[in-house]
């Protein structure tokens, strides 16, 4: 178990730990280099096979696709943002069946979406270590998903992000393959888009990268397409209502959701004592109901927060599915979160939210919603995340998050609650 300091951050590793990290990075680099060389050979063969063929730009005038595959093998928030591609394609090609290929850990959030004909899951992360090559179950899983994809006979495949998505776009047998040229292997894409995500010096949001690909696939993009929208099934709302009734959450008090954890970097988390201070004030002084969200793996961090609290909050971490989490965030009056998947879910279901950013740049990965308020301290080293590894502080201080104090977050929460709960404003006036 990782030891954390009083703020909930890992300490600076010793020399042995740092050396181990370097050796792991070196082995991964060697493996990826070998893979790159092999895939370049495959790409050259693909290019030779279509040499002399001319492809007209994709549009409703030149193609009428029956089946389209969208591939996003990434975290929950990235998948939510990638649904902008699905929306634009479905509007442009209303008669097409659109399938989504996603990670098993993320796919549930969009499984009930009416714009999708099918959601297929696959996790390529099993191949991250060389020993995976000797495990038969990994080969069987890969062959199974490839057979399923090829059986669908896709007309267009959109590789939204990464080399694995590009490889699976080729493996699907799709006639036209759309993706960023510098995120796929040479020769893999028939309709290549120049550049890549996170180009140096380019401050485009993830949604804008997604919409670049949608345009290349022939979609007509409107300004409204920049706002991600997430479908929440009625069954998920009903299941959530039962859960809230069981734990004792009522409808007559403000409901504040707090997501204290974050994937892909511990520096994206707000400090543990700050969470405890904020929640104590919301429950004790404002009479709000606070619900803590998260996965089962987030429980140790949540328990740290709760151990420092004087008031009581509702801990629903590990008790909701992703669909129920979306219903919970839709039901909440406000979400407070760092840069996380639930932050993007809340934005996509139309919930007011406060997004606390430190190492990551909200211009790249912030919530896209008129109801979102972004807080960041803007110290000299922030943002520092470059997408080459987890968002961890190289100075082991995470000062960018420590500078955002609970009083500021509380002030914004109260602003967002005043319209719905007028008595909150009157009680503040009396104070």
Where are these regions (language model features)?
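Catalytic machinery of carbohydrate-active enzymes
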Residues: 1-431
